[in-house]
Regions:
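Short hydrophobic/charged patches on amphipathic alpha-helices used for structural packing
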Residues: 34, 90-91, 155
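An N-terminally biased module of ancient metal coordination in phosphate/nucleic-acid-related enzymes
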Residues: 1-60, 152
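Active-site gating/metal-coordination segments in enzymes
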Residues: 52-148
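Residue-level detector of solvent-exposed, low-hydrophobicity positions
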Residues: 14-18, 44, 72, 129, ...
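Short, intrinsically disordered, charge-balanced linker/junction segments flanking boundaries
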Residues: 154-160
Length: 160
């Protein structure tokens, strides 16, 4: 049986992230992750891309990872600043073979999934036949707003 890690984040080497990895008996590196994947017979992973819309930021080893371009709170400034060219930037990712979808973070951005700003993103995902993943439920940030990421809010978008 082939195992795929369907949701992971890769963070640059920084004192905080490196210490967190060491605290649970690991190293914060792709090389270490490759080793652990081999030991656990995990054949591939899907990186939930964060922190940037620059395509150059999302250069993961293709034999090991695909990625979803993430529209997180750093990209959308917690919903305060949505770039006018957001659809164009997202499309550049969706054109790439190693990009397998888009990830939305409504609770962190305080943007309803039914907000007009997301419609071009949904349309692009449909055009490129790639899924939209959505961070629903509890968040890792205490100042995120759960009302935006309650599972029932997805119903409005998915059912309509």
């Amino acid at each position: 049986m082939k195992i795929i890690d369907a949701h992971l984040h890769i963070f640059p080497s920084e004192p905080g992230t490196d210490a967190m990895a060491r605290g649970v008996g690991h190293e914060n590196s792709v090389e270490h992750l490759r080793q652990v994947y081999g030991e656990l017979e995990i054949v591939h992973g899907v990186v939930m891309g964060n922190r940037s819309l620059e395509t150059g930021f999302h250069n993961y080893p293709r034999d090991l990872f695909h990625y979803c371009v993430g529209l997180d709170s750093l990209v959308l400034d917690r919903g305060r600043n949505i770039p006018a060219d957001l659809p164009d930037q997202v499309e550049e990712h969706l054109k790439r073979d190693n990009c397998c979808g888009v990830k939305l973070y409504p609770g962190y951005n305080r943007i309803w999934l039914s907000d007009d700003c997301y419609q071009p993103i949904y349309d692009l995902a449909a055009r490129y036949d790639k899924p939209v993943a959505i961070h629903m439920g509890l968040t890792a940030f205490s100042r995120a707003h759960l009302k935006y990421c309650h599972p029932l809010t997805l119903d409005e978008v998915a059912a309509d």
